[in-house]
Regions:
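Gram-positive cell-envelope targeting signals
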Residues: 1-62
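Extracytoplasmic metal-acquisition and chelation regions
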Residues: 37-38, 51-386
Length: 386
């Protein structure tokens, strides 16, 4: 079963259609560029409005910054510090929608088109970005791809013992179907420009998939905050010293919390955690040498665990005498509860580690920050490491 999602926007005197085709096993994005005489007239007003907005933006001293996810947004706000009043900062995923299911609107694309700084993760879920950037009105825009910034620190998805893989039969069917049409390969032509993003395309070339959840490492966060600071210093040189000072101070806070995590793990007798859920915390556990077991990989769309997966994880809880079974935020806890019910003691705590994939703008207004979530996660993690 597939869904076709179509939206149009005006750019360079033409009406463009972005067609997003989503299958169960993955996402495929196709850009169809047509000059539609029948609908151009209907979009003339929109085109004029866009042009006016772009012109107005040049006369507006406020920086225009667009981020996709909450961690990026919060990092930007910390680097801006008391200069935040001089910037309009947008978080596209502001209603708690998961990165993996996000569908950009025409308004989102237009906002990106004229911004000064655009920040996105750069994984498989962001395949729509490449086409969006091709339509950018502001050719001086600075773009930060988190996964590109981290380079070799980016990790491949891994399927470990006991973890349930994707439905192979369904995947094979969709894979074959996706290659039935020549137009599905139009995106190959889009790779000519010199700002290709390696991590975005590796999984197409060799079927390697990279773990997108890079923000869940405090070490990665330090690197990325520095990149954001350097970008802001280029865009707004008059406030460069302030941005550097703010970034240095914030990075100091990230380092301090990183040390707290390390100390907690070093002092723990148990260094294994188990998730009755998908597992987006690969970067975090690797930072501190923790072992993990989980029902699904981090980007899995699976929601029902097999009998074999439940049995394996239940036995692992018994074998290691694990006191906690984890889930991630906003998820059904039935798998974790079923694992516990199949253990010998049936008394494990079901706790949540927050992967920051459902943070909304209202949460931000209520004081949620990247550091506050990571501090809370540390408190919860300590429960499991006793």
């Amino acid at each position: 079963m597939r869904t076709i999602l179509i939206f149009a926007f005006y750019g360079y005197g033409k009406v463009h259609l972005l067609v997003r085709r989503k299958t169960v096993s993955g996402r495929l994005f196709i850009k169809v560029k047509k000059i539609l005489s029948a609908v151009v007239a209907a979009f003339l007003a929109l085109g004029s409005l866009t042009a006016c907005n772009a012109a107005g933006a040049k006369g507006n001293k406020k920086l225009q910054i667009v981020t996709t996810i909450f961690p990026e947004y919060d990092w930007v706000m910390n680097v801006l510090g008391d200069k935040a009043s001089g910037a309009d900062v947008t978080m596209l995923l502001d209603n708690g929608v998961d990165l993996h299911s996000f569908q950009p609107t025409a308004a989102d694309i237009m906002k990106i088109s004229s911004c000064d700084l655009f920040i996105y993760v750069g994984g498989e879920s962001d395949e729509w970005v490449e086409d969006a950037l091709k339509e950018a009105v502001n050719k001086d825009m600075i773009v930060i791809n988190l996964m590109d910034e981290l380079g070799d620190a980016v990790k491949e998805e891994e399927l470990i013992e006991g973890m349930q893989g994707e439905d192979e039969e369904e995947h094979d069917h969709d894979h074959d179907e996706d290659h039935d049409h020549d137009e599905d390969h139009d995106h190959d032509e889009d790779h000519d420009h010199d700002e290709d993003h390696d991590h975005e395309h590796h999984h197409h070339e060799g079927e390697i998939e990279y773990d997108e959840h890079v923000w869940l490492s405090l070490k990665n966060a330090q690197v990325l905050v520095k990149s954001i600071s350097e970008a802001l210093q280029k865009i707004d040189a008059s406030n460069a010293d302030a941005y550097k000072k703010n970034a240095d101070s914030y990075i100091g806070s990230l380092k301090a919390l990183d040390e707290e995590y390390k100390a907690a793990v070093d002092a723990a007798s148990n260094k294994t955690i188990l998730f009755g859920d998908r597992f987006p915390f690969r970067y975090m556990v690797d930072d501190y040498g923790l072992t993990y077991y989980a029902a699904f990989i981090g980007c899995s769309a699976e929601t029902e665990a097999s009998f074999e997966t439940i049995t394996f994880l239940s036995k692992k809880v018994d074998e290691l005498s694990l006191p906690v079974i984890f889930t991630i935020e906003g998820k059904d806890k039935r798998i974790a509860e079923t694992i516990s019910q199949n253990t010998a003691t049936k008394d494990q705590k079901i706790l949540t580690l927050d992967s920051m994939q459902s943070v909304s703008s209202s949460d931000v207004k209520n004081g949620t920050t990247y550091l506050s979530i990571m501090e809370s996660n540390l408190s919860v993690l300590k429960e499991a490491l006793k």
